[in-house]
């Protein structure tokens, strides 16, 4: 994995921007089963549509306002309910957008499929979390912890996709 990250300041709003790549197919490593772009895409969409498979502490997810390339979700973690919108760019990108709500600042996660060569496949995870300058100092010390949690969650996601692919469940979704 390669990591790129940083914090960028614009117009008195601090945006924690963090991104990293996870290599899906490595032609030099025969121990890893290769996934097709279609399998990977199906898995990333499954993560958005069935998040309880990927987030064990999620209590409930309700999906509504579905269009051809987007849907709204209401995620419940105990008493906390978070609303987000998922935008799909087929076979390329899944983007989660959380509008500011209650004590939660606006944020986004973009997962982009990258194919630098015919034999390689990556997912780029990009996080943006905007908060105002007043809360910046309080949040700064937590950013490293959040980055680490994001990476672990993303590694777990890809691990789950590999497991589902090995069981043929991602191929079944394609039919």
Predicted regions and their residues:
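Hydrophobic ligand-binding cavity/cleft-lining segments
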Residues: 11-62
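A conserved amphipathic terminal alpha-helix motif
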Residues: 138-175
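Hydrophobic residues positioned within well-ordered beta-strands of beta-sheet architectures
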Residues: 18-20, 71-73, 84, 96, ...
């Amino acid at each position: 994995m390669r990591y790129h990250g940083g914090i960028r300041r614009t117009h008195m709003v601090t945006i924690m921007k963090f991104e990293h790549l996870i290599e899906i197919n490595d032609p030099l490593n025969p121990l890893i089963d290769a996934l097709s772009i279609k399998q990977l895409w199906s898995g990333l969409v499954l993560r958005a549509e069935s998040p309880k498979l990927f987030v064990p502490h999620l209590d409930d997810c309700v999906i509504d306002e579905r269009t051809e390339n987007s849907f709204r979700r209401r995620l419940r973690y105990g008493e906390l309910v978070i609303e987000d919108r998922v935008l799909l760019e087929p076979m390329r990108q899944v983007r989660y957008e959380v509008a500011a709500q209650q004590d939660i600042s606006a944020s986004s996660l973009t997962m982009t499929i990258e194919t630098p060569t015919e034999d390689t496949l990556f997912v780029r995870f990009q996080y943006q979390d905007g908060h105002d300058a007043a809360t910046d100092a309080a949040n700064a010390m937590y950013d490293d912890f959040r980055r680490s949690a994001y990476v672990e969650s993303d590694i777990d996601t890809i691990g789950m996709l590999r497991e589902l692919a090995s069981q043929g469940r991602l191929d079944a979704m394609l039919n």
